[in-house]
Design a protein with these regions (language model features):
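Extracellular and organelle-lumenal recognition/adhesion modules and their flexible linkers in secreted
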Residues: 21-183
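N-terminal carbohydrate-binding accessory modules
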Residues: 171-245, 432
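Surface-exposed, active-site-proximal loop segments in enzymatic domains
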Residues: 231-251, 277-293, 325-327, 484-492
């Protein structure tokens, strides 16, 4: 058996049918750069990574090139066995044990680093790391060469990879296009409702009535209330469903309070279950793979529907935040069916409330190409817009601020990124809208405070949303500094200072007012 296509029936048998990775055309053996050779070595069929305590700035990798030039509408699946000792957990993104793929997205020029879930700290015995990466209709950029990566990123510990266990294949899409022709119908009040425009509120129960009053004065009429914070809490301690239930109750109490403030001002709320049992909807979570967590997710929405039934300020129930399912789930627990189950549970209690349904790939526009419409009325479909990510997220989420002269601008003529390119990226969403008579809600979009041209990017995004008739909420209001439109960077100190006289703030407030 070779390591190219396996028939779909083989998938039921699982990874045991993976063929060993052979030398690929245009590929090479595992290589170790000179800069990390003192931490990484190969002994027979073992890759040893040993980074001593106190060393935390090293990417101790072995890499292997792979030709992905003809990989379209398919998936890469890979696995390897690994064991470790004294691994130190670093809570910052992307640190830790690595089985990953490094490649460049040819659509936007962004570098991608998808990685397998892996033990985060301490000692662990032989563990099977599994990586799955989906590719769309456009081939991966050929340069720089895509690389498979094994190792330890920016933390210390000792790892042993069994290279003889490394398996790899090119597989069919996890979610082949299975669209239907269902035409969504909406109640008269929803169909005739004016445009809803607003922001994602503060996380971790930190919204205030003054926040809502200020948003009302700015012209907003919608707030996405994120019930979040549990994923970061889980990283700090071993968590249980009891912990999650207590967290949910605190968030629902806060949501009731915020909803009252909104209703008093004739504004509405998107209720967003940002953290499911017990963590996230992608690499950081198990809701698709642990039956108890999946069932609790559905039950939680049943409880929420009972609690908020009849509240006039509910715009809709936002079932999932940014599902990123890349491997097979339990039966009826994949991102689509789990949302279906939750929607059915809600409708059994409240037949009138609006459901907000999430696309895969972190609500990405591309995922609308294979998203099937739920055969249920009064469902709004949600997209998030952060393309190109190399522009929107430069300096965000703990990443260092780009050095002067290295920032990515918008528009970006060198990469062909402008308003029409944004339209191209959003095309699958617009096509889904037309095909199903579906309402679309942009739950998140943004550009970092450090991004040159961020204000123009927001204006162009909002212009497209308005053209298509989509409701939207900006990410986010008075939360992380890199998204806060009420601040600017003091170039003398490099620190944020309050100042509303900036392009991002004006773009957003003009958008609220339909300008």
């Amino acid at each position: 058996m070779d390591n190219v296509w396996l028939v779909e029936s083989s998938l039921a048998i699982g990874l045991a049918l993976f063929a060993p990775l052979q030398t690929l055309a245009g590929g090479s053996e595992w290589t170790i750069s000179k800069g990390v050779a003192k931490y990484v070595r190969i002994e027979g069929d073992r890759l040893i990574v040993d980074v001593p305590p106190g060393v935390s700035n090293v990417c101790a990798y072995a890499m292997r090139q792979i030709d992905l030039s003809d990989w379209v509408h398919c998936r890469l699946e890979a696995e390897v066995k690994c064991r470790g000792t004294r691994v130190v957990r670093d809570p910052r993104p992307a640190r830790g044990v690595k089985l990953s793929l490094h490649y460049t997205d040819s659509q936007d020029g962004d570098r991608r680093y998808p990685a397998a879930s892996a033990p985060e700290e301490g000692d662990f015995g032989w563990t099977n790391l599994q990586l799955a990466v989906s590719f769309g209709e456009v081939p991966v950029a050929a340069s720089p060469k895509p690389q498979l990566v094994l190792g330890l990123q920016q933390t210390s510990g000792r790892l042993e990879f069994d290279l003889s266990s490394f398996r790899f294949r090119k597989a069919p899409p996890l979610f082949p296009q299975r669209d239907n022709d269902y035409q969504v119908k909406y109640p008269a009040a929803v169909a005739a409702r004016g445009r809803m425009r607003g922001v994602m509120g503060r996380g971790v129960c930190r919204n205030t009535e003054q926040d809502i009053e200020d948003l009302k004065n700015y012209g907003a009429n919608l707030v996405r209330l994120q019930m979040n914070g549990f994923a970061s809490r889980k990283r700090k301690k071993a968590a249980t469903l009891t912990d999650w239930n207590e967290w949910l109750e605190r968030n629902l109490v806060h949501a009731e309070q915020v909803l009252g403030w909104l209703e008093k001002r004739d504004m509405q709320m998107v209720l967003d279950l940002h953290n499911p049992p017990l963590g996230g909807y992608g690499r950081s979570g198990d809701v698709f793979y642990v039956q108890e967590y999946a069932d609790r997710f559905v039950e939680a929405w049943r409880e929420i529907a009972k609690r908020f039934k009849g509240r006039k300020g509910i715009y809709g129930y936002d079932l999932m935040n940014e599902p990123s399912q890349s491997r097979r789930a339990l039966p009826d627990c994949d991102y689509w069916n789990l949302q279906r189950r939750a929607a059915e549970a809600i409708r059994a209690i409240d037949p009138d409330v609006t459901i907000i349904f999430a696309a895969n790939e972190a609500n990405g526009p591309r995922a609308f190409a294979y998203l099937a419409a739920l055969e249920m009325d009064n469902v709004i479909y949600q997209v998030h817009m952060y393309k190109p990510g190399g522009f929107t997220h430069q300096g965000a989420n703990g990443a260092p601020r780009p050095a002067p002269g290295t920032e990515r601008p918008y528009p970006d003529s060198a990469r062909g990124v402008d308003k029409e390119k944004l339209r191209t990226w959003l095309k699958p969403v617009a096509e889904f809208q037309r095909r199903h008579n579906a309402k679309i809600y942009v739950g998140e979009f943004s550009a970092c405070i450090y991004a040159p041209g961020a204000g123009q990017y927001l204006r162009d995004c909002i212009s497209l949303f308005e053209e298509y008739g989509w409701d939207w909420t900006y990410h986010s209001f008075r939360e992380a500094l890199w998204w806060n439109v009420e601040t600017v960077i003091d170039e003398a100190t490099g620190k944020p200072v309050p100042n509303k006289n900036n392009d991002r703030f004006h773009a957003l407030v003009d958008g609220f007012k339909g300008k």
